[in-house]
Amino acid sequence: MEGSDFLLAGVLFLFAAVAAVPLASRLGIGAVLGYLLAGIAIGPWGLGFISDVDEILHFSELGVVFLMFIIGLELNPSKLWQLRRSIFGVGAAQVLLSAALLAGLLMLTHFSWQAAVVGGIGLAMSSTAMALQLMRDKRMNRSESGQLGFSVLLFQDLAVIPALALVPLLAGSADEHFDWMKIGMKVLAFVGMLIGGRYLLRPVFRFIAASGVREVFTAATLLLVLGSALFMDALGLSMALGTFIAGVLLAESEYRHELETAIDPFKGLLLGLFFISVGMSLNLGVLYTHLLWVVISVVVLVAVKILVLYLLARLYGVRSSERMQFAGVLSQGGEFAFVLFSTASSQRLFQGDQMALLLVTVTLSMMTTPLLMKLVDKWLSRQFNGPEEEDEKPWVNDDKPQVIVVGFGRFGQVIGRLLMANKMRITVLERDISAVNLMRKYGYKVYYGDATQVDLLRSAGAEAAESIVITCNEPEDTMKLVEICQQHFPHLHILARARGRVEAHELLQAGVTQFSRETFSSALELGRKTLVTLGMHPHQAQRAQLHFRRLDMRMLRELIPMHADTVQISRAREARRELEEIFQREMQQERRQLDGWDEFE
């Protein structure tokens, strides 16, 4: 691909992402499916803007590489050792059982046994990029099902090595390709990478950080990620596995958060590129000529993997409420299938359209996962949000919740405990299924699901409640929920958490006057204590705190019309000077009034 063509492709990718992803999110089908549909639209079987899919697909695998590096940063070696049973137990069982079942089914459709074995192994793998992205979206990272899912994905990355080595053996060309000397050299090189990374990475980054130049630190981080990926690729191993190991080696270093910050923007863009490339690779010609075969194969693939994963989760002791999440998120085929099937095709293991059929099956199975997870969410919502007992009656006056609390993280838990301590009837809405299980044990009335769904709010008693407290982590979710409540439940008193001044402006513009900036009150309290340590009388420090709170809120309201204006920054500076002048003037009037306490407003 020439330079101008590469630039044009980049512009097309960005345009497709900007156009498709917001639309997909608005339709409620998720960003991942939006990327896939965008890829179909601009690919060779869509509008035909881009035809060199293989080259772009190979480049876009860097998105998975960056993602695995960040995941490695979140896992220290001791944590990885704790996962050994799930990695080599559940992970190995999933690959072997799924591969055996799928290979047997492929043999029934006129695949040779060699091609069926390769096909079964390739289909048994899941998409690391899609599964990890969905697990993050569903907040499964810290749950039991999320940890187990990650273990399975990690074993699949490890299984890449023997799977690729198996292809020439099945093709009957082992003598030409199976060189024990080369294998020994690769093992030594891999061990050398581990030892070198263990003892050299931290001193190198310490030296780079001492320069104080942020751009150099970012460049060094990119060099580490791309270099380790290239090194592993040269050894014939998984690039993602190499960067994951590099991340683990730096997980306990003092540079962990800085490394993650430097990599995160690249990871997001390249992951989007990967999903677009997968959409582009969908062969609509094969789909059209073999429609029935492909549809049946996608259904069978997803069903077999869900069955195997669900049974393994049950044997492993995963909670029943989390088994379907675990099975659903790993039910698709994966990006490794593209590599394995291409290698097998070069060894002439496949006949006719067999490779194309398998690749179409993998691509379509990846497209079903976001939709499948939405169905799983609805099923879990019915399971958790139905009557707790069969003879439970509809709401009566004494059972109606007075307050609905959306989100039960650390912020929401404090509010919930305060309300419960004062005998208030509350209902909690939470998207983290592990938190739902835990809160139910403590006697909270908790509903699982997305609070931006009107039906869930009704089920939770929004029509009978007096107030709703919104403590979402994401500002977009907060504003969407405010809009829904104002439209469908206008009687509710809306109270919201604002993560900062910008979100506070947005809430005020939306008509929400009861909100709390999560760091503002605690910062004011610490400031009051600081004034006391500097010799100010406690009563005077309290008044200073109250005046500052009142005047800051006034300035916040005055700046609402300028929230999106280009002169906002200069006006904010003027407001700060006015605030200081008014504050000093009013405090001088209060200096001799050292007794009495005002109330917070």
Curated annotation (Swiss-Prot):
Subcellular localization(s) per the UniProt record: Cell inner membrane
Keywords: Antiport, Cell inner membrane, Cell membrane, Ion transport, Membrane, Potassium, Potassium transport, Transmembrane, Transmembrane helix, Transport
Gene Ontology MF terms: glutathione-regulated potassium exporter activity
Keyword Lyase: no
Residues in RCK N-terminal domain copies: 400-519
Top-level taxon in the UniProt lineage: Bacteria
Disulfide pairings: none
Membrane topology: Multi-pass membrane protein
Keyword match Transport: yes
Database matches in Gene3D superfamilies: 1.20.1530.20, NAD(P)-binding Rossmann-like Domain
InterPro entries given in the database record: Cation/H_exchanger_TM, K/H_exchanger, K_H_efflux_KefB, Na+/solute_symporter_sf, NAD(P)-bd_dom_sf, RCK_N
GO biological process, one term: proton transmembrane transport
Ranges annotated as spanning the membrane: 4-24, 29-49, 55-75, 87-107, 115-135, 152-172, 177-197, 207-227, 230-250, 268-288, 291-311, 324-344, 356-376
Oligomeric form and interacting partners: Interacts with the regulatory subunit KefG.
NCBIfam families named among the record's database cross-references: 2a37 (TIGR00932), PRK03659.1 (NF002973)
Family designation: Belongs to the monovalent cation:proton antiporter 2 (CPA2) transporter (TC 2.A.37) family. KefB subfamily.
Protein name: Glutathione-regulated potassium-efflux system protein KefB
Species whose genome carries this gene: Escherichia coli (strain SMS-3-5 / SECEC)
